[in-house]
């Protein structure tokens, strides 16, 4: 496994481009199972989860390939660490050179006049179904990510049968698939769960009126699944309490490009007129609002000055207004924003809600920022109330916080200290990276395979902004010197003889110590 070694305390400055959204790309790729013809997708992010979805779709009879060969800098998600631009070959040299003028963006002259010079874009992805015989999505692939469940709807609608393992993903709380099954059953599917798999059959689905509200709001993947299946159903389907997230809208727009008839996208009420077939189409995946929010918080936590390209500002209204309420300066121009910190930030209370509220996928990153803002702040998660597994790691970097139910109470401090920390899930890994960027000294973030699932080459974007960050193999020899602790550093404890007291039976006079002179 790999880990990040980060030298904190550097201001992020520069310009980077936001990649395509993971939470849109995965259900869109799954929906290609229902297409009759080739599909061309652009701006699909280079993620471990995309690789997993690719393997899953190939196992279900789909041909997937990148149209143009490309090997952008840092295209690999793991492997040997590149030498630093300033010539350092080891972490100690890199740390010492972290403030050199040649490393990272050294001046503001080129930061804000033109779009990001190295967008790290992946080539277009071409997907086409070549064999419809296989309908089993096996456990070995599905267990790796929760979005694998999105193949259930298109498989059932197109092939009339499906067998999909119950999904995996990050351990962030209870996320049942009952609403998926409820929606598909309403369309006429015959469903059962047996041996850890969902077994589904239907000759042809039929339109129905479906309510998809749950205990904590609408279901995003459930809406994607049922909406995709309903496009090939006979008649009209009405979905109430549908998820309104931009990623659901992007999937709906993609399905409409393939010939579907979906109206009401972006509202809780969807109307879907069933069609006989979906044809191939071309689509550009929308920008990742969670990656954008993470980098906005990275700029704020380092008192930086960062421009982010390829932004849909209408998807980030809650994030922008929350940061402005803390004292962060945000300038908007076109499809880009500039995030700056020009003074002290203020603590605040925030609640994570379904879209258009503050996204739960930014809860951990927001906590990282609030840990560096002196004063009391409170974060409440109304979407996943148990999504606080990362809280235990914050004490390692000197943060003061405690959890109470669905809330975390944070007593912010101006200075975090570098430490070795371990990620528990995808967004927690990003939050720990942000904390390490702000901390004094060196930090190590372990289990970054979580981060590779949802962030497109994040370390290269942070390097472009001037961060001192290296990916290396997780081994004790690769720890920076500042985090290698030895018992020799502990001085022996000296206790004056006058403070030493004998056992009670000696003090009572029952026995007497005899010195050599007395003998």
PLM segments and residue spans:
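Short, structured segments at the rim of ligand-binding sites
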Residues: 1-95, 99-519
């Amino acid at each position: 496994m790999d880990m990040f070694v980060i030298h904190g305390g550097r201001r992020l400055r520069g310009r980077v481009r936001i990649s395509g959204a993971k939470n849109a790309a995965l259900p869109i790729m799954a929906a290609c199972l229902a297409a009759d013809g080739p599909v061309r997708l652009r701006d699909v992010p280079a993620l471990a989860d995309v690789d997993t979805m690719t393997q899953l779709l190939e196992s279900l009879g789909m041909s997937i390939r990148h149209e143009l060969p490309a090997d952008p800098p840092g295209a690999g998600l793991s492997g040997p660490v590149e030498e630093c631009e300033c010539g350092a070959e080891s972490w100690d040299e890199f740390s010492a050179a972290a403030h050199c003028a040649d490393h990272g963006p050294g001046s503001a002259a080129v930061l804000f006049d033109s779009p990001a010079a190295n967008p790290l874009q992946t080539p277009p992805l071409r997907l086409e179904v070549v064999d419809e015989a296989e309908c089993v999505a096996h456990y070995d692939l599905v267990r790796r990510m929760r979005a694998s469940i999105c193949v259930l709807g298109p498989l059932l609608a197109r092939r009339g049968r499906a067998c999909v393992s119950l999904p995996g993903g990050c351990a962030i709380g209870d996320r049942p698939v009952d609403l998926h099954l409820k929606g598909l059953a309403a369309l006429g599917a015959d469903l059962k769960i047996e041996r850890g798999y969902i077994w589904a059959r239907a000759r042809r689905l039929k339109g129905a009126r479906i309510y998809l509200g749950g205990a904590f709001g609408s279901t995003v993947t459930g809406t994607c699944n049922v909406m995709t299946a309903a496009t090939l159903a006979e008649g009209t389907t009405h979905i109430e309490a549908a998820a309104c997230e931009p990623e659901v809208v992007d999937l709906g727009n993609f399905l409409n490009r393939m010939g579907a008839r979906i109206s009401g996208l972006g509202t809780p009420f969807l109307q879907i007129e069933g069609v006989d077939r979906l044809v191939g189409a071309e689509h550009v995946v929308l920008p990742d609002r969670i990656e954008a929010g993470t980098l906005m918080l990275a700029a704020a936590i380092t008192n930086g000055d960062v421009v982010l390209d390829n932004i849909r500002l209408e998807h980030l209204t809650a994030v922008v207004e929350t940061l402005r309420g803390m004292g962060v300066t945000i300038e908007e121009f076109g499809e880009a924003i500039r995030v700056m910190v020009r003074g002290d930030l203020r603590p605040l209370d925030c609640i994570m809600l379904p879209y258009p509220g503050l996204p739960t996928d930014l809860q951990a990153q927001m906590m990282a920022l609030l840990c560096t803002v002196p004063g009391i702040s409170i974060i409440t998660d109304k979407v996943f109330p148990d999504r606080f597994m990362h809280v235990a790691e914050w004490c390692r970097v000197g943060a003061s916080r405690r959890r109470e139910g669905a809330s975390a109470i944070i007593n912010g401090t101006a200075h975090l200290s570098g430490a070795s920390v371990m990620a528990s899930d995808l967004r927690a890994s990003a939050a720990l990276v942000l904390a390490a960027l702000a901390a004094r000294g060196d930090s190590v973030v372990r289990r970054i395979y979580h981060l590779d699932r949802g962030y497109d080459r994040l370390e290269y974007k942070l390097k472009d902004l001037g961060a001192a960050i290296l990916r290396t193999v997780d081994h004790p020899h690769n720890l920076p010197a500042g985090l290698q602790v030895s018992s020799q550093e502990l001085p022996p404890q000296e206790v004056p003889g006058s403070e030493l007291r004998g056992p009670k039976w000696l003090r009572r006079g029952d026995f007497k110590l005899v010195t050599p002179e007395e003998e």
